[in-house]
Swiss-Prot record:
Belongs to the universal ribosomal protein uL30 family. It comes from the Bacteria. The gene is rpmD. InterPro entries: Ribo_uL30_ferredoxin-like_sf, Ribosomal_uL30_bac-type, Ribosomal_uL30_ferredoxin-like. This is Large ribosomal subunit protein uL30. The keyword Ribonucleoprotein applies. Part of the 50S ribosomal subunit. It comes from Geobacter metallireducens (strain ATCC 53774 / DSM 7210 / GS-15). Gene3D superfamilies: Ribosomal protein L30, ferredoxin-like fold domain. Keywords: Ribonucleoprotein, Ribosomal protein. GO terms for cellular component: cytosolic large ribosomal subunit. GO terms for biological process: translation.
Length: 59
C-alpha cells in the first residue's frame, strides 16, 4: 500500500466549498491540470474521496 498515486486536478476550484479548496491545497493541487505524485496512505485516500469529482487518479 506504499505505491505512489498520480493525482491530476481536472476541475477548477472556483465555486468549490472552502473545505474542498483546503484539501486540494493540502495535496499541492493549486492550478488546473497540475499533477502530483503522493504515497498511497489512508490519509491521502480520504482526501481524494472528498474531492473525487475534481481530480483524476492513476496508479
Amino acid at each position: 500500500m506504499s505505491a505512489g498515486l498520480k493525482i491530476t486536478l481536472i476541475k477548477s476550484q472556483i465555486g468549490a466549498p472552502t473545505a474542498q479548496k483546503a484539501v486540494l491545497n493540502g495535496m499541492g493541487l493549486n492550478k488546473l491540470n497540475k499533477t502530483v505524485v503522493l504515497k498511497n496512505t489512508p490519509e491521502i485516500v480520504g482526501m481524494i474521496a472528498k474531492v473525487s469529482h475534481m481530480v483524476k487518479v492513476e496508479e
